[in-house]
Amino acid sequence: MRTTPTFPTKTFKPTAMALAVATTLSACLGGGGGGTSAPDFNAGGTGIGSNSRATTAKSAAVSYAGIKNEMCKDRSMLCAGRDDVAVTDRDAKINAPPPNLHTGDFPNPNDAYKNLINLKPAIEAGYTGRGVEVGIVDTGESVGSISFPELYGRKEHGYNENYKNYTAYMRKEAPEDGGGKDIEASFDDEAVIETEAKPTDIRHVKEIGHIDLVSHIIGGRSVDGRPAGGIAPDATLHIMNTNDETKNEMMVAAIRNAWVKLGERGVRIVNNSFGTTSRAGTADLFQIANSEEQYRQALLDYSGGDKTDEGIRLMQQSDYGNLSYHIRNKNMLFIFSTGNDAQAQPNTYALLPFYEKDAQKGIITVAGVDRSGEKFKREMYGEPGTEPLEYGSNHCGITAMWCLSAPYEASVRFTRTNPIQIAGTSFSAPIVTGTAALLLQKYPWMSNDNLRTTLLTTAQDIGAVGVDSKFGWGLLDAGKAMNGPASFPFGDFTADTKGTSDIAYSFRNDISGTGGLIKKGGSQLQLHGNNTYTGKTIIEGGSLVLYGNNKSDMRVETKGALIYNGAASGGSLNSDGIVYLADTDQSGANETVHIKGSLQLDGKGTLYTRLGKLLKVDGTAIIGGKLYMSARGKGAGYLNSTGRRVPFLSAAKIGQDYSFFTNIETDGGLLASLDSVEKTAGSEGDTLSYYVRRGNAARTASAAAHSAPAGLKHAVEQGGSNLENLMVELDASESSATPETVETAAADRTDMPGIRPYGATFRAAAAVQHANAADGVRIFNSLAATVYADSTAAHADMQGRRLKAVSDGLDHNGTGLRVIAQTQQDGGTWEQGGVEGKMRGSTQTVGIAAKTGENTTAAATLGMGRSTWSENSANAKTDSISLFAGIRHDAGDIGYLKGLFSYGRYKNSISRSTGADEHAEGSVNGTLMQLGALGGVNVPFAATGDLTVEGGLRYDLLKQDAFAEKGSALGWSGNSLTEGTLVGLAGLKLSQPLSDKAVLFATAGVERDLNGRDYTVTGGFTGATAATGKTGARNMPHTRLVAGLGADVEFGNGWNGLARYSYAGSKQYGNHSGRVGVGYRF
């Protein structure tokens, strides 16, 4: 296939459709061709040298005035059943509005062409073409493009009938040592060249050819942050160089072999920036009869009419047949440029669908527009004394139905070059090819038909309104294309979403057209738009989700599922599969699914719905199969103990009795009881309703406690009791049995005063009623608010540890006045019946100790502390400030008496989950006073040590203020609390001097609460006005073992220090404490 005319250019003489433009120069090549000379890496400016211009005249455009309006008759493959198809003289007289050029998306002028195609949304969504195989069938002397870092790692193959012409190619090798040497390529088959070189090793690359420029537009990387990267920089490129080196032009057999090899390698998208040029003008293909043979002959005539012409050889050698085979059997999409002859018709390759109807699904023709986005690029060239020649993009012409437009001008940049400005439809086509790669990355299951439908129907309409003969479907819109098709104009759109049910794909455009949707495959497809396409929707496999309105009538096969999400609507529905009514969100708003036609649920299918959802049918409903009714979710509202009817299906007429459901299953949630289905008839039609009521929360919680961990049983039962008390109050309120409870509560209506205090309470209680029964233990436990009692008990125990530290200090003070500063760190775990709570604390104290008499020592300290407590889904933070004091009186060597005192204020801040899905926060203030009296007897131990037996009592008095949580109607409103606890203390103390400056200590003992501790808080839920209850609490171990080790050291000059470790715990509870301090003795 030889290009006419030829040009004296050194780089290439292809039929490739390009105009390569340097910074200040333009090169226009005839026959749709174009090129650049080799870049001079030592030159300034763009690095591009001389360019050539064509001097051969072009054929005049042929008028289409004779085409009749009935041109679409019997040619549905062209007109796709549309009456508004705009081609040739049927172009609309009204122009579309100017396109949105998105001029600010890519501010760098070298990326300006990306603005025209709205590429930014695709890039921001993370699509780069990764995993997509793209073929490039092209030409050009430069076979070193893969050596550029922008194209590094790509594959390049050459095809030629005369393989020996390739044996002279020399490539650079990139061994591990980083060196390089010239090697001669060896070729045993048609895969002539397949090499890789280091990204920085480009010294042997001397030319940038057409093949390099096209490859860069599709998949060039932006190196070192420079702009002008390609559309799909992570796509895998299979670069097919079809050049005949002896003639420096493309070979017909090489093109055909390239397509074959790409098909064998599984490549799905192929860029073809070349074509043949029409010399006989634009033949009127619509004037002939409809037989295939006459189409074939017309196509041959269109390609030139000369029996020796390369265009006829193309047909004789079945290149069109080869192309058609790969479209039909290899699912490949071929993208062609229209050419640069400023003609009204594109090159002949684009005409295949006239001769092979099915080929339309695998071919896209691309015209080029200027930077305005709505005009063709036109330029005049000519030598002095000759007639000027016009160059620029060919129109879509009679290929309009499979044609769109893309920028004619672009910019690329290779390493060691300045940006190269290029122009021509050779670069319009790869812009579309790169976008197709992004689309296939997002929707890897899309067929060639899916891809071309999506790319065409999402284009911005430019020129004459509708599909027109100049711009086809309009200007490529990559951002919109990434949201799926916008129309089904070519018949049914088959979405075979291969994969598993946990994978979901979304179409977010509004979809129109006369075609339908056939959903296959296991994955989910979501339709988010308001769709008006009129063909049928058939779900053969996987699930289809409707988020908006859908005009189409629908059919669900046995392996399919239709999900109406929220208040979606659709046409008539016939189902043998699954129909599922889902919630848009968790707001609890009642939503109606509207079927604008009839409903037929066959015996093999299942209707999944929930209370509060209404399936409204305008026509007749024939119901059968299985019904699965769930009371989960908030939409059913609050249920009282009496019960009420909740409608779930209404129709103009229900054609079969509701008992025709062969199987009914229900999920009542935690507290909802679904008793029976009732059918009622009214003036507006028939209705099916469920009669529902609530269960008893206390009994449900008691049953749930049997399966709860032992440590939660009491709290679960207490939470159920609290909730039942609340719901008895709600049942008695004025509107508790009203079907519009949730809506009325939300509105807080003044004409129903009984509901005003309960608005949020009804909603919170309803959420618990309709929660998952499996969450019962967690929910009931949260309604007991045990964190208040548990964190208070942990704080009281920690203050007791701090008071014991003061007591121990009295035993080892020595003479004189001593000032001491200490820090104490505590950590503990409380395990009870498989449930765990954790405590962490830190206290800083300063104090004094002194001899106040010959046998008397007194001490006082001020401490500030913070502790945290965590359990289940609740956390507490306690801040405190406390005063500690003690006095010891020695009775000679026999023993001693001690008096201890502490008084502290604390603030306990709580954050926790409550109910089904709510969160509450609160804070409570309190005081803790401790009084202790101890006596000790000294027992001689070894030669220098002392053993002391100590015992006594301590009284803890806790007073806590009333409080109310915020954030939830199921938060706790607690009464004030006063609790006194008597604690028995007994232990042993051993001291052993190591020298006159160091003493070791060891302690062991036991503590026992003589009357137990009960820090539970009476009160009620914040959303109640009368119902009462109390919080739960863990069982604080009555008996706790204590032990400790420590040392005191005199540093000299009055300075001294101490270190202590202590433990207090039981089988369920353990607290570890570490304390260090430094003091000065006056």
UniProtKB/Swiss-Prot annotation:
A Gene Ontology molecular function term for this protein is:
serine-type endopeptidase activity
- Endpoints of the signal sequence: 1-27
Say what happens when this gene is deleted: No longer processes NHBA. Bacteria are more susceptible to killing in human serum and human whole blood, human complement factor C3 is no longer cleaved, increased C3b deposition on bacteria.
Q: State if Disulfide bond is listed as a keyword.
A: no
The family database entries (PROSITE patterns) matched by this protein are listed as:
AUTOTRANSPORTER, PROKAR_LIPOPROTEIN, SUBTILASE, SUBTILASE_SER
- Per the record, the domain of life is Bacteria
Which residue ranges does the record assign to the Autotransporter domain?
Answer: 808-1082
Lipid attachment (S-diacylglycerol cysteine) is at C28
EC identifiers of the protein: 3.4.21.-
- Provide the coiled-coil residue spans: none
**EC top class, in one word?**
hydrolase
Work out whether the entry's keyword set contains Transferase. Answer: no
Q: Name one GO cellular component term.
A: plasma membrane
Q: Where is the Peptidase S8 domain?
A: 110-482
Q: Where is the lipid attached (N-palmitoyl cysteine)?
A: C28
Posttranslational mods = Probably auto-processes to yield a 68-70 kDa form and a C-terminal 30 kDa translocator domain; upon overexpression in situ and in E.coli full-length protein is seen as well as (probably) auto-processed forms of 68-70 kDa and 30 kDa in size, suggesting this may have protease activity.
Keyword terms: Autocatalytic cleavage, Cell outer membrane, Host cytoplasm, Hydrolase, Lipoprotein, Membrane, Palmitate, Protease, Secreted, Serine protease, Signal, Virulence
Q: What is the effect of changing S426A?
A: No protein processing seen, protein is not secreted from E.coli. Does not cleave human complement C3 alpha chain in vitro. No change in passenger domain uptake by human cells, but no increase in host cell metabolic activity
Q: What does this protein do?
A: Major human immunogenic protein, detected in patients recovering from meningitidis. Autotransporter with a secreted protease domain involved in processing other autotransporter proteins including App, IgA, LbpB and NHBA. Probably autoprocesses to release the about 70 kDa passenger domain. Both cell surface protein (Neisserial autotransporter lipoprotein NalP) and the passenger domain cleave human (host) complement factor C3, generating a shorter alpha chain and a longer beta chain than normal.
Homology family: Belongs to the peptidase S8 family.
Q: What is this protein called?
A: Neisserial autotransporter lipoprotein NalP
